[in-house]
Design a protein with these regions (language model features):
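Extracytoplasmic
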Residues: 34, 52, 101, 133-137, ...
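Short, surface-exposed glycine/acidic/tryptophan-bearing loops
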Residues: 62-111
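Surface-exposed patches in mature extracellular/periplasmic domains of secreted proteins
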Residues: 27-28, 49-63, 76-86, 128-143
């Protein structure tokens, strides 16, 4: 691994290690595996309505999504370009992945509920196009910001190189209700 990639990888680890953690209160700052699976289920039910194949929860996508949610929370910066101005492609490369396709949805202050997030994303044309995009893998991160008590969300969507060809969907009115 080159010195640059090693330095970036160490920085990536530092961001993950510096993120908020669950404390003794009732507030859950990080998304739980049950919530991640619930969001995946909502995505796949939606994709099924449009005759798209389901996605699977992917550990690498989840790691990249969590780290970006932590970065947005710590920096209070809502952006697809994260630390060192890295986008989702560069963040996936840090974990050793070079997906065929990649997409990212981010959000701020929607709240902790998965259904509220899905409703907000699906009513946005740009987010909906990602949810219904050519992806077969999915990962999500949610962090309660320690500075502002708002929720920072990030979802990473990808298709592995050489994976099956996922069809495009023609966008129209939303036919899904959450």
């Amino acid at each position: 691994m080159s010195l640059i990639m090693s330095t970036i990888s160490n920085f990536f680890k530092m961001i993950m290690d510096s993120g908020p953690t669950k404390d003794d209160s009732e507030d859950v700052t990080m998304i739980t595996s049950d919530e991640a699976n619930e969001l995946l289920t909502l995505h796949n039910k939606t994709r099924n309505v449009y005759n798209l194949p389901p996605m699977v929860l992917d550990e690498d996508c989840s790691l990249v999504a969590r780290s970006h949610a932590i970065w947005m929370s710590n920096s209070q910066n809502i952006s697809h370009m994260g630390f060192s101005f890295f986008g989702p492609v560069q963040r996936m490369a840090i974990v050793g992945k070079e997906p065929e396709n990649i997409g990212e949805c981010i959000s701020y202050s929607i709240g902790p509920e998965v259904k509220d997030l899905m409703r907000a994303w699906f009513t946005s044309e740009s987010h909906r196009s990602i949810i219904l995009g050519k992806y077969d893998r999915f990962g999500v991160g949610r962090v309660l910001g320690p500075h502002d008590n708002n929720y920072y969300w990030c979802a990473i969507y990808s298709t592995a190189k050489g994976a099956h060809n996922v069809p495009n969907v023609k966008m129209s009115e939303s036919i899904v209700d959450f």
